Amino acid sequence: MKLFLSYILDENTPTYGDRDKLTITPKSQIIDGVGANTSTLNFSNNHMGTHMDTPYHFIENGKKTLDYKAEYFCFDHIYLIEKLIDTGDLITLSINEINSIPSDVEFLIIKTGYCKYRSLDKYHNDNPGLESSLAYDLRKKFPKLRAIGFDFISLTSWNHREHGRLSHRAFLGENDILVIEDMDLNNVYKEIKFDSLILAPLRTLDGNGGPVTIIADVNNKYKKQNEV
């Protein structure tokens, strides 16, 4: 069964600190007598919705989206950790949690349950973030790890913005771990086995990151609303 793990982009898409907006306006409409429906999409910031941060987002000479080959975005070893969080604090993983992760992991998913607040102000102005030290712990133990994703709006906690800059540089620095923010994890749980995952980024020339579509192939019998 295949599932979308990325949200639909619309004008209600939350943004970090509620500082940006996506607007979608019709450009031409068949109802007006023209030959096709077209729209204008205006992103006031490319980092909104389910999106990817590349090293160039925080590192001047860092890699950009186009520096990655297609196979880099295809993952066969995915692992999900459930760590329920209800406040905008910094997150790290215990020794036991880190030891539970398979040694060959390529894409690590952290489900906090914070996605339940996505329609509330709390989601964008009291969000958790990741401790910078976690990047070093993961990189040291899991040499095949290429991406980390989670169900809150940014790697940077709104309450710990200075530390968030350190965290971004820690994850996106040497031997970078791509950061996938604002994933739709409403319908995935630790019991689900991931067979594969495809990360499809919007490929732009000056790619410091941007919206992504994520499709996961899961070994599970039930069906949910985001099934492909």
Regions found by a protein language model. Name each.
Residues 1-228:
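Active-/binding-site microenvironments in catalytic and ligand-binding cores
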